[in-house]
Amino acid sequence: MGPDEFITLPVRDLERSRRFYTRLGWSLHPSSFRGSGSGTVLIREGEHAMVLSEDRHRHLVGPGTPGTPADASVVNALSVDSHDEVDAVVDRALRAGGTEVDAQDYGFLRSRCFRDPDGHQWEILWVDPAAATRHPAHPQR
């Protein structure tokens, strides 16, 4: 297994984000969300979301950073193990207060997108492994 990966997200309300991500079924780092202006959410082994108060995020990236989460200039895409798991994850996100943005189903690829309460866009997708190896971008060996 390689090194851990972190996505850093500015949020307006840390407590709301904590509730949203735990309702999504993701877990919290044990020392997170304890008055530091930040928290770490474990998406799955090796994948984390660092949520920072807007002030803490501004300190990290500096003043005058263009864009807001609602711009959706970044889509955080996570692949899952099955077609049905796409729906399970996104349905939990919607029950937790997320908003559905888009969905695609081509049989060999299933994708649904949602925005979290701060407007960050997430794409949950599944690609049939057999179909992916037949795609022109993946030459046969």
Language model: regions and residue ranges:
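Vicinal oxygen chelate
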Residues: 4-12, 41, 63-92, 94-141
